[in-house]
Design a protein with these regions (language model features):
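A short SAM/SAH-binding and catalytic strip from SAM-dependent methyltransferases
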Residues: 91-103
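S-adenosyl-L-methionine-dependent methyltransferase catalytic module, highlighting the catalytic core
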Residues: 106-108, 121-241
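A short acidic, Gly/Pro-enriched loop at the edge of an enzyme's catalytic core
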Residues: 81-92
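Class I SAM-dependent methyltransferase SAM/SAH-binding core
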Residues: 28, 32-81
Length: 241
């Protein structure tokens, strides 16, 4: 369980109805929500993001089924697939560390607007373009200068910053393998955008939106911009009609 899972459930303000998670990954939040709320949970991920682990789909399915969820509660789709849910299906929609990986954000936000029930709330926890340290590689500024990503990864890894040692220990990576892996990952699978982009896009498609820092700084919204340089933030979207 991630430390922010309880915060996410608390921030939704409701604990029952239908909940959809976008980008469910290993299914950990689905399990947590199913076991710690009265939500009927569903999740999906895209097959293109399943990664290099060929057993991931089977492993996640077995984990969810063994915990009492239905196999149909977690589906895999292609990037080009339309979400197979009816209009107004969900009281709550959640994404965790997913938004920065979505290339066509307008399409996904439009689907959120379609899928939320009136009064429903979407909550996204993710790093914006303001963040100074790329959370995937752990390397400062690695995502800030697309034409210099390799050089930045190499420089900071040489100084001991980032996750190179973790990957060396866990996957037996050489430094060049680590650099090439994250150069490709940041170039092709990460699409960092600034906070105001998400706010403006949400409003454009008819969702009231705001953002805030993580608890316990929730009551200090004036710190959100500052906090966004150092950690992920929460983006809220509410469907009013």
């Amino acid at each position: 369980m991630k430390s922010y899972f309880p915060d996410i459930l608390n921030l939704l303000k409701v604990s029952s109805g239908d909940l959809l998670e976008i980008g469910s990954g290993e299914g950990d939040f689905l399990l947590y929500a199913a076991q710690n709320s009265n939500f009927k949970v569903q999740g999906y991920d895209v097959i293109e993001h399943a990664g290099r682990d060929p057993n991931r789909k089977t492993r996640v399915k077995n984990k969810l089924v063994n915990a009492g969820l239905n196999e149909q509660d977690y589906i895999w789709l292609s990037n080009k697939d339309i979400l197979p849910f009816k209009d107004g299906s969900f009281n709550a929609i959640v994404s965790i560390q997913t938004i920065e990986h979505i290339k066509n954000t307008e399409r996904v936000f439009s689907e959120i607007q379609r899928l939320l029930k009136p009064g429903g709330l979407a909550l996204h926890y993710f790093p914006s373009a303001e963040i100074l340290i790329d959370p995937h590689s752990g390397v400062p500024l690695a995502h800030k200068f697309p034409t210099k990503t390799k050089e930045i990864l190499s420089f900071f890894s040489l100084l001991g910053f980032g996750k190179y040692k973790l990957y060396a220990d866990k996957h037996n990576y050489s430094k060049n393998e680590f650099i090439n892996e994250f150069d490709n990952y940041l170039s092709n699978k990460c699409f960092y955008r600034k906070l105001n982009y998400y706010i403006n896009l949400s409003e454009k498609i008819g969702l009231n939106s705001w953002y805030s820092p993580p608890p316990p700084l929730q009551n200090f919204s004036f710190l959100t911009k500052l906090v966004s340089y150092f950690t992920s933030i929460y983006l809220f979207q509410k469907k009013t009609i």
